[in-house]
Structure formats: structure tokens, C-alpha cells
């Protein structure tokens, strides 16, 4: 049985002032577990590729990369960048990762994803992968923004993710949780952080703002700004 590995970093808010936060950056652990595979012999499927952040990080190593995303604008940006870089082994396709049959994209040896995962994606990945091939991904953990009182429908708890992997036909070989928590001296610091990070506007429309205010008024002074699960699993 694979045990969960946990990493948590705590920051005082003052240490972050003036530094733009990047909540969609690539995990070094994710890159490591992907690059453990012989990528020069592999065709990769990058699910929810966006403008290609993960795909472009792997272009030197991979034999071929196919990125898929439902945002036509993001796919155009990715295609333009691949063309500018002369990368003829990288392809980007505009489609819905939860409805397309991955087998229609051709043989796939390794499925990867950065912060785009669902039970349906796991099922479709299992359908395209041969036994002993792998999926490796980062996904949101249920503790992401937990102080707001609202959990993303795309976020996983450890137990639910293990169940989804097992039911999808995967055997985990690496399971990790990476967290970053910011500590505030007072409520004003917390609200200032949300404004400077560009989060406030979205939270005011999706219900998180009111939940976070309630948390602050009750004396809470932390915010889990990053909570991701990092997974590598073998197709059974």
C-alpha cells in the first residue's frame, strides 16, 4: 500500500507582500514522477493543457505530445507557441476532456494533467492506456481555500481519490499532498491579500467571499492558498 507523502509550507503575509502569487505553477514533484518514464519512447496526452504549460515543459524529453483543452483561445495560444518554437511533435486539440474518446487521438502511452482531473477523465484515461502504462497528474485537494467554506467540485479528498483510482483501474505508485498556508496578523491583511492576488472579485461572485468573512470574524487568520494532490498510478 502506497502511503501519502505530505509537504506543507507556512508563510507570514508580510513575507509575500509585493510578490505575485502563481497558483497554477508546475509542481517539481509532478515533473519528477513524469520524467521517471522513458519519455523519448512515449506519446503523452496532456489533459486540460490550457496554453501548454505542462506540455512545453516536456517537449525536449517526449517523443510526441498531444494536448487537449476545451478553451479554443488557450489552444490557439498553445499552437502559436509550438509553431514559433518549431515543435512539430507537439499537437493541440480543442475538445472536452470529459466527453472525447481518447482512443480517437491515437495510441497513448502516458496521460498527464496539471490541475485538471475528474473521475470521468480517469475513466477515459484508463480506456486508452495499455496495462502497465501510467497516469501522472496534479489535482486540487479539498483543503484548497478551505477557510472560505466552499470546496471546488474538482477537488479531491485522499480517500475519494484512492477510490476513484481503484474503480478506474489504476494502482497508485505515488501519492502526495502539497500545501501552502498564509498567516495574517489581522482581517485587513487577509482582505488585502485577496485584492492583491486578484481573488476578491471572483470570490464575491462564487460565494467564497462571505464564507471567508465569517471565518475571519470568528478569529481565523490563515488561508490555504495551495492544496494539491500529486499522483502517479499504473494501469492495471
Feature locations, PLM:
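A short acidic, Gly/Pro-enriched loop at the edge of an enzyme's catalytic core
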Residues: 102-110
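A short SAM/SAH-binding and catalytic strip from SAM-dependent methyltransferases
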Residues: 109-122
